[in-house]
């Protein structure tokens, strides 16, 4: 079995700390070249020789490369990159450690741009995992408090942050266990299949170089085109009865022994102008670890989950800092506004914008957009410093719970406004056909718009609300923040009702303060 790691994974801890070859903000060319590392990616029964040229991945990779180049060019450079106060070197704002309200505003604008440029469709853009790693630094001392003779977990975390920041690396993550037998208690994720082979990721042995791990992890979105994979526990699985299943670490996506199984593509029209959003299929993957070596300096947690339980709020105390930052909030805002604008343009294109019931549906969608905007402003207003000096946004857990409900409703409204047009439109090849085009011009145009405009608009709506791509996005929005029911329960446990309960008890003691009881 292969147990080593290439490149940084086998480098010394000092090499990560020094990060001498600081490369600055990622560029498109550097990003694409970094993916040609022999990573073991599988899709539809075949091993992918090169993800940068495979039809299922190349459009997404090209789009990310385009955005990486934009962040290094005017007018985006000054908004998406900055000078790092710690090193004086230019870095991506995604990796900026926020030390003030102004830093948080800069990070908001950076996240807005990442999501505007990708139409709010990337749940795992490069801007997503950077705040996750940054915010773990808030608990650096607690990670360090868990002792191990081979390493300091808090120091490892800080060094890894510096390493990623200097290179502007694109991280994916994997938190959940394989969906094999959910009847097992979530605090005991040691499951068995066949000849007592354990399914959950676990430590097989310790060596002088690190720990060797085996098992499966899901669901790693964007794994085929990421550069690093952060592996940890979700709030659902944070408590374990078997300590060897308790670990958090990061490895290169091309690490030997790591197999990546991508799902079937959701798009039939790779690179098609006719379905513009489907090039943003970021893929979702299973990760299989076959005796993968994780060096000591890349471990952040081992055997003791206490810091991670605290970070995730799985101890019932609630999370006192918003570790997801702006990335998800801005993505949701862009997605909501896109769906509302498309629905409005569809209503205009078929002459129903003034219908009372249609206008009411559009107004409902606009209401959701405005509520979200005000909520984002509230999260920013509640921002403040942590004891470590790092600035954090106000709590946003309740917003993500709300959006799991609203997202499905907005998709439903878009479908209703489009009516049958969302499934019956001519293709680009139909539009190019000289024989059939006259019929399209006559029978498939809209109100004051030609058939090209109308069909392309409706196909955009189809991408959002009726295609395999759109359904995948809807499912992603429901689950990406974890089990919505668990999130609601955790919110209830930390929701302060003491004041109102006390007033109600007083009311029940004296129900008629200005009269007499009968």
Region locations from a protein language model:
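Acidic/polar, glycine-rich intrinsically disordered N-terminal extensions of enzymes
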Residues: 2-82
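Glycine-rich flavin
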Residues: 82-228, 234-249, 254, 259, ...
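FAD-binding core of flavoproteins
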Residues: 178, 182-328, 496-517
């Amino acid at each position: 079995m292969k147990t080593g790691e290439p490149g940084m994974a086998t480098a010394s801890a000092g090499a990560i700390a020094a990060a001498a070859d600081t490369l600055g903000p990622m560029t498109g060319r550097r990003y694409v070249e970094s993916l040609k590392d022999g990573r073991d990616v599988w899709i539809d029964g075949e091993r992918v020789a090169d993800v940068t040229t495979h039809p299922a991945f190349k459009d997404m990779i090209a789009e990310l490369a385009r955005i990486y180049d934009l962040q290094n060019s005017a007018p985006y450079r000054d908004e998406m990159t900055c000078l790092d106060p710690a090193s004086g070197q230019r870095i991506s704002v995604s990796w900026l450690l926020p030390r003030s309200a102004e830093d948080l505003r800069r990070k908001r604008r950076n996240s807005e741009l990442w999501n505007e440029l990708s139409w709010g469709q990337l749940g795992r853009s490069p801007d997503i995992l950077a705040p996750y790693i940054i915010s773990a630094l808030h608990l650096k001392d607690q990670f360090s408090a868990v002792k191990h003779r081979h390493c300091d977990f808090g120091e490892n975390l800080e060094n890894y942050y510096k390493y990623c920041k200097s290179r502007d690396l694109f991280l994916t993550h994997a938190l959940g266990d394989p969906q094999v037998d959910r009847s097992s208690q979530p605090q005991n994720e040691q499951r068995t299949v066949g000849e007592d082979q354990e399914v959950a990721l676990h430590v097989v042995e310790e060596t002088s170089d690190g720990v060797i791990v085996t098992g499966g992890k899901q669901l790693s979105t964007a794994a085929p085109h990421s550069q690093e994979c952060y592996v940890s526990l979700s709030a659902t699985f944070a408590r374990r009865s078997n300590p060897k299943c308790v670990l958090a670490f990061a490895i290169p996506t091309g690490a030997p022994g790591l197999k990546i199984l991508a799902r079937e593509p959701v798009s039939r029209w790779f690179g098609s102008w006719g379905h513009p959003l489907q090039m943003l299929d970021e893929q979702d993957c299973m990760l299989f670890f076959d005796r993968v070596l994780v060096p000591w300096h890349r471990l952040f947690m081992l055997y003791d989950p206490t810091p991670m339980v605290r970070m995730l709020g799985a101890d019932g105390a609630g999370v006192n800092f918003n570790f997801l930052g702006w990335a998800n909030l801005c993505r949701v805002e862009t997605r909501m506004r896109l769906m509302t604008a498309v629905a409005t343009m569809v209503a205009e294109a078929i002459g129903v914008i003034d219908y009372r019931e249609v206008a009411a549906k559009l107004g409902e969608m606009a209401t959701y957009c405005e509520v979200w905007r005000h909520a984002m402003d509230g999260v920013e207003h509640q921002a403040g410093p942590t004891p470590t000096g790092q600035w954090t946004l106000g709590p946003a857990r309740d917003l993500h719970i709300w959006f799991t409900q609203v997202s499905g409703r907005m998709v439903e409204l878009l479908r209703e406004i489009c009516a049958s047009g969302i499934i019956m439109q001519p293709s680009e090849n139909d539009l190019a056909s000289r024989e059939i085009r006259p019929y399209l011009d006559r029978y498939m145009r809209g109100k004051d718009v030609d058939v090209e405009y109308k069909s392309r608009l409706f196909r955009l709506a189809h991408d959002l609300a009726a295609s395999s791509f759109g359904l995948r996005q809807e499912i992603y929005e429901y689950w990406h923040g974890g089990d919505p029911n668990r999130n609601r329960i955790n919110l209830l446990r930390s929701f302060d009702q003491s004041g109102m309960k006390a007033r109600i008890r007083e009311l029940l003691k004296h129900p008629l303060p200005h009269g007499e009881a009968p």
